[in-house]
Swiss-Prot record:
Source organism, top-level taxon: Bacteria
Protein name: Fe/S biogenesis protein NfuA
Disulfide cross-links: none
UniProt GO MF annotations: 4 iron, 4 sulfur cluster binding; iron ion binding
InterPro entries per record: Fe/S_biogenesis_protein_NfuA, FeS_biogenesis, FSCA_dom_sf, HesB-like_dom_sf, NIF_FeS_clus_asmbl_NifU_C
Assembly information from the UniProt record: Homodimer.
Metal-binding recorded as keyword: yes
Required cofactor names: [4Fe-4S] cluster
Keywords attached to this entry: 4Fe-4S, Iron, Iron-sulfur, Metal-binding
Length: 190
């Protein structure tokens, strides 16, 4: 599943020698399968290992991965490079981001980006956006809810973040329109 070069194994062994006895390595996948997916390494104290973790054994240490992340780490490579900044670990995980098939209908592709890229950012303010439809004249029709409904920044968010992102990824779209009947309430972010 994960290949760790000899150089990287030696470096990780050196780092682990400075940690509490029994500490291993954990590979984490954040937002797996989405365009904002990230992969990282962390120390893994032995008391944080669960039955749902997959254990990968190497010569001097073990790597733990949660079961849900395994398919995203297939063919992953961890290497070590030395440059002017010092030693750096590099993680290459070719299956970290699911490819959106170009044959998938535009509505589904746009919705996937809204769910995986846009809504996680809006959730920081208690809001979200729902894709209602894409019109025949190629406008994405959306509706805000939660903290976004009634927020004084909603026009800015729509034009400068949502529309820019969607037009960048889907040039066939002509724009994004808001269908929301905005009512400022105690739950509105601003």
């Amino acid at each position: 599943m994960i290949i760790i070069t000899d150089t990287a194994q030696k470096y990780l062994t050196t780092l682990l020698a400075k940690q509490k006895s029994g500490t291993q390595i954990r590979v984490l996948v954040l937002n797996p399968g989405t365009p904002i997916a990230e992969c990282s390494l962390s120390y893994c104290p032995i008391d944080t290992v669960t039955k749902k973790d997959i254990k990968l054994e190497f010569d001097q240490f073990c790597v733990y991965v949660d079961q849900l992340s395994t398919s995203y780490l297939e063919d992953a490579l961890i290497d070590c490079v030395l440059d002017e900044l010092g030693t750096q670990l590099i993680i290459q995980a070719p299956h970290l981001i699911e490819k959106i098939d170009s044959n998938t209908p535009l509505l589904e592709r746009v919705n996937q980006i809204i769910l995986s890229c846009i809504n996680p950012q809006l959730a920081n303010h208690g809001g979200k956006v729902t894709l209602i439809t894409i019109t025949e004249d190629m406008f994405a029709i959306i509706q805000f809810s939660g903290g976004c409904n009634g927020c004084s920044m909603v026009s800015y968010t729509l034009k400068e973040h949502i529309e820019k992102k969607l037009l960048q990824l889907f040039p066939e779209l002509k724009g994004v329109k808001d269908l929301t009947q905005h009512n400022h309430s105690q739950y509105s972010f601003y």
